[in-house]
């Protein structure tokens, strides 16, 4: 069907959401606006759905949510499943989309366990496992701006769906007509018949009680914390877990305390960026704190800023990941709770400092593709062998961490607990997290790790991103700013090429659109990959040197050379 016909069809049929028809009327005759909404269908990919809220096949709305959920329902039924758990965050229409998904699943005879109020993503993973559900859905767009929403699907293990299973769902989704293709059941009728059931508060308490068991050291110092949930889902559970372990001195940023999908004081509610901390930093001028803590809207990622004497230093995901790994291994080794053959997991784009730390404690470190599902998958592999107690920590540089086996996704609630415990422990020794990080660098070398994103909006942007990746493959660099490229790992072809000999060896990780350039022989690297959830290409750089200045100079030179390839 051509785009104009699709547009006219939506004008005629998209009447159940009062916001859609006025939007469609407002773009009449505007070819670019119509094209962007209808040039493709919002794809059910490995991260589920994510897109701008609005009218059209390329937008998040009740029709695209129903279509995706009908496909998911057919997948669940084809696998012999019969139950699902659903959670949602504070975003615009998250509650609406969650109920629409529940109606579709119930109409297909699938029992739905629905949180009655907004809830963090990790608590969806926990519910799937505890309630023995076949699948799970969380309605969220994580840290994206307020105009976005999304929909992540989970397997019975509590991990986001694997690539293989996502593709199976997509096959079913593609067979569902946009209008009238999804089965629907009245929400209240489904509640009365028990096809939709609210998840009891006892499960929320069980989650908090369970993650509290992962605390290592008792809190013995008065750690002063400023916390912001960034108008998301973290407010209640994060404060509850900190109270539970004895972190009492917590001041919450009032403007960002309550749920608000408009994110009025943080248009980009992303704990990776300084702007998300602006309100917390301002509050810290009146209420000095040792630690500033920010969780994203669905509370699966957490960022921190640490008092440095002159103000506050924001710490990166790689730095926090390295600190947590070292803290967990060192303290559990000291108190005799570290398992034999401990295992930690990180993504390939995360800091290689983790390898040095893991080696010190005879901890096996497994590298996986980007995406926390691959970390959860490794826990599942251990579980199948009865060895899940070997898992001590998993992290990715994009501020996602977990140290539990009861949740198979990144978890900002348990991580907030562990960060505060760690900060309190070191405060008792007269150290800040910045001091401890400096000690790690003295021991293992300076690791300058950076991540840079380049945005390519719309249909033209998608094509540009494909062309950039194709050009990099067709014209592999022999050197980057004077540093020899010693190996190229193309996860698209699953081949590693030794650039000196031309010898190729297979890569055992799954296929992915990632190019990994090994520079020199000291562990330096540059990695290029398109984002799986946003219209961006990301460049990850690791530069290792004996001083921060030298590492930064190398990193900047490599970044500039790759930026030139994007123009």
Please identify what each model-predicted range represents.
Residues 2-101, 108, 196-222, 233:
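An N-terminal, well-structured beta->alpha segment
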Residues 85-148, 244-304:
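N-terminal small/polar loop signature for handling phosphorylated ligands or for N-terminal nucleophile
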Residues 123-181, 297, 308, 397:
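Active-site phosphate-binding/coordination module
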Residues 289-291, 331-529, 536-538, 547-552, ...:
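Phosphate-binding and adjacent anionic-ligand microenvironments
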Residues 33-38, 42, 149-278, 283-284:
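Gly/Ser/Thr-enriched, mixed-charge loops and adjacent short helices
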Residues 83-89, 224-227, 402, 542:
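Short glycine-rich or small-residue beta-strand-to-loop segments that form or flank ligand, phosphate
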Residues 38-58, 142, 229-237, 241, ...:
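Conserved phosphate/anionic-ligand binding catalytic regions in large, soluble enzymes, centered on
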